[in-house]
């Protein structure tokens, strides 16, 4: 793979946003907000895992993600590609294949039998590992996976995702404080811009979603929703 043969990063961001919209991975509902794993409600939901069921779009998105990592971090920056259990595993496999590198995966916690391993696959001591996931919000789950990688004797200074929320400045700051650089293909801003160009959602919905993204706590508070 030669990164210079691919579109620039902003074009790849827009194209990835369009692909996510086309496979109906993006959901907005301002009347009945979605409840996320954190327990907080939001009018936005994205399911990047749908990519694995759409081969042509999946292939393009994984080409783009691999290209972005190689542009940002370098062609020879890694020795191993690791996926986080479970959503990150297929994406790590796709990236590892494109970079011709070994792949492993990281469990959320050590298994309670056998060798009680938390890292599956071979990850040599000192290996430079790229952690691949489907998306990131506040980056919290990434840090747990990175800690497991580092505790296994490898190094991990980079994580790559298809989608980053992009409206939480503390995310990259939190990751950077732990020595981790985030590489993401596309964000909510890219998705909304593409949705507006393609008329995927009405303008009232997009405007309300933008209000939420600019002030999530205020948006929830105005509706009497949990803000903690």
Swiss-Prot record:
Binding site for orotate: 137
EC id: 2.4.2.10
SUPFAM superfamilies with a match to the protein in the record: PRTase-like
Gene Ontology MF terms in the entry: magnesium ion binding; orotate phosphoribosyltransferase activity
Cofactor(s) this protein cannot do without: Mg(2+)
Catalytic activity: orotidine 5'-phosphate + diphosphate = orotate + 5-phospho-alpha-D-ribose 1-diphosphate
Keyword terms, alphabetized: Glycosyltransferase, Magnesium, Pyrimidine biosynthesis, Transferase
Superkingdom: Bacteria
Pfam families per record: Pribosyltran
BP term (GO), one: 'de novo' UMP biosynthetic process
Sites where the protein binds 5-phospho-alpha-D-ribose 1-diphosphate: 107-108, 111, 133-141
Enzyme class (EC, first level): transferase
Recorded metabolic or biological pathway in which this protein acts: Pyrimidine metabolism; UMP biosynthesis via de novo pathway; UMP from orotate: step 1/2
Role, per record: Catalyzes the transfer of a ribosyl phosphate group from 5-phosphoribose 1-diphosphate to orotate, leading to the formation of orotidine monophosphate (OMP).
Subunit structure: Homodimer.
Family: Belongs to the purine/pyrimidine phosphoribosyltransferase family. PyrE subfamily.
HAMAP family linked to this entry: PyrE
Protein name (database record): Orotate phosphoribosyltransferase
Organism: Jannaschia sp. (strain CCS1)
Source taxonomy: Bacteria, Pseudomonadati, Pseudomonadota, Alphaproteobacteria, Rhodobacterales
């Amino acid at each position: 793979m030669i990164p210079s043969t691919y579109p620039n990063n902003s074009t790849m961001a827009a194209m990835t946003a369009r692909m996510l919209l086309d496979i109906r991975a993006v959901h907005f509902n301002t009347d009945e907000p979605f409840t996320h794993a954190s327990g907080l409600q939001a009018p936005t939901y994205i399911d990047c895992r749908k990519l694995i069921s759409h081969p042509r779009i999946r292939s393009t998105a994984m080409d783009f993600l691999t290209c972005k990592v190689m542009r940002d971090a370098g062609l020879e920056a890694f020795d191993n590609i690791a996926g986080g259990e479970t959503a990150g595993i297929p994406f790590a496999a796709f990236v590892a294949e494109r970079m011709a590198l070994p792949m492993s995966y990281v469990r959320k916690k050590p298994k309670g039998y056998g060798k009680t391993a938390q890292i599956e696959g071979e990850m040599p001591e000192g290996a430079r590992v790229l952690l691949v996931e489907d998306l990131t919000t506040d980056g919290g789950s990434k840090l747990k996976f990175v800690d497991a990688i580092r505790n296994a004797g490898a190094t991990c200074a980079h994580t790559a995702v298809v989608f980053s929320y992009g409206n939480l400045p503390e995310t990259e700051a939190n990751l950077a404080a732990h020595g981790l650089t985030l590489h993401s293909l596309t964000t909510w801003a890219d998705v909304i811009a593409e949705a507006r160009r393609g008329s995927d959602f009405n303008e009232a919905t997009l405007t309300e979603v933008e209000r939420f993204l600019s002030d999530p706590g205020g948006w929830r508070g105005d509706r009497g929703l949990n803000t903690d």
